[in-house]
From Swiss-Prot:
GO molecular function: nucleic acid binding
Membrane-spanning intervals of the chain: none
NCBIfam families linked: PRK12497.1-3, PRK12497.3-3, PRK14678.1, YraN family protein
Gene3D superfamilies on file: 3.40.1350.10
InterPro entries assigned: Restrct_endonuc-II-like, tRNA_endonuc-like_dom_sf, UPF0102_YraN-like
Name of the protein in question: UPF0102 protein Cagg_0930
Record-linked Pfam families: UPF0102 (PF02021)
Record organism: Chloroflexus aggregans (strain MD-66 / DSM 9485)
Family statement drawn from the similarity comment of this UniProt entry: Belongs to the UPF0102 family.
Amino acid sequence: MPTPKRQLGDRGEQVAAVYLERCGYTIIARNWRCRNGEIDMVARDGDYLVFVEVRTRRDEYALESLLMHKRQRLVTLAYHYLAEHDVPETTPWRIDVIALTVVGNRLVVTDHVMAAIGEEGCA
């Protein structure tokens, strides 16, 4: 049985997926894994391939919980995904972060930061 923290994270990813679809994104993959870790979601936003990190917290510090080592690992994971899926080098991509916070009994998207992790991946 998943821990309460894992259950909250799973709920957050479900809410984030619905949010992205309502914003016009197409979800390509969820919980994509390789030996280096996991990407919560891979989506399309127009011409962009978007790697999405979902941060779900019970307090208002969801975005602040994304530490530097995790940011660096997300960039590494994005490169692994691009290579494994033979994505053309000309394909523009970015890493977005979606923050959700528990408000009462609901999960609320509090932030959606596009290209949140530097310019490393933008073609």
